[in-house]
Amino acid sequence: MFLLHEYDIFWTFLIIASLIPILAFSISGLLAPVSEGPEKLSSYESGIEPMGGAWVQFRIRYYMFALVFVVFDVETVFLYPWAMSFDVLGVSVFIEALIFVLILVVGLVYAWRKGALEWS
């Protein structure tokens, strides 16, 4: 039978974990001195005078590489726990993981054919 009080620890932890950052940002916003000036609006490069403009437009290739990296990084996050418990889960979970990997391979082939991985 589903009893709501079994999850009291979870809800307590969730509320505390949500309140700590909210309180930290609120207190720092109330206690921090407000000082606006021209230096506050200038860009910062490790204590050195900035060279050039602060707003630089990056080429789309950087974003494509970042997107492909994130996709395969997420794949690793999903597949590692599956690999650690492979012997317990059974054949059906193996087939699901295989479908997941095949979908990612199709995405990789698509990105490759579109030239997203070429740096010319």
From Swiss-Prot:
InterPro entries, A to Z: NAD(P)H_OxRDtase_bac/plastid, NADH_UbQ/plastoQ_OxRdtase_su3, NDAH_ubi_oxred_su3_sf
Record's subcellular location: Plastid, Chloroplast thylakoid membrane
GO biological process, one term: photosynthesis, light reaction
Catalytic activity as recorded in UniProt: a plastoquinone + NADH + (n+1) H(+)(in) = a plastoquinol + NAD(+) + n H(+)(out); a plastoquinone + NADPH + (n+1) H(+)(in) = a plastoquinol + NADP(+) + n H(+)(out)
GO molecular function, a single term: NADH dehydrogenase (ubiquinone) activity
Main location: plastid
One Pfam family hit: Oxidored_q4
Annotated EC: 7.1.1.-
Transmembrane stretches, start-end: 9-29, 64-84, 88-108
Keyword annotations from UniProtKB, A to Z: Chloroplast, Membrane, NAD, NADP, Plastid, Plastoquinone, Quinone, Thylakoid, Translocase, Transmembrane, Transmembrane helix, Transport
Protein origin, superkingdom: Eukaryota
Membrane-related topology note: Multi-pass membrane protein
Enzyme class per UniProt: translocase
GO cellular component: chloroplast thylakoid membrane; NADH dehydrogenase complex
Cited function: NDH shuttles electrons from NAD(P)H:plastoquinone, via FMN and iron-sulfur (Fe-S) centers, to quinones in the photosynthetic chain and possibly in a chloroplast respiratory chain. The immediate electron acceptor for the enzyme in this species is believed to be plastoquinone. Couples the redox reaction to proton translocation, and thus conserves the redox energy in a proton gradient.
Quaternary state and interactors: NDH is composed of at least 16 different subunits, 5 of which are encoded in the nucleus.
Family statement: Belongs to the complex I subunit 3 family.
Name of the protein described by the UniProt record: NAD(P)H-quinone oxidoreductase subunit 3, chloroplastic
Lineage: Eukaryota, Viridiplantae, Streptophyta, Embryophyta, Tracheophyta
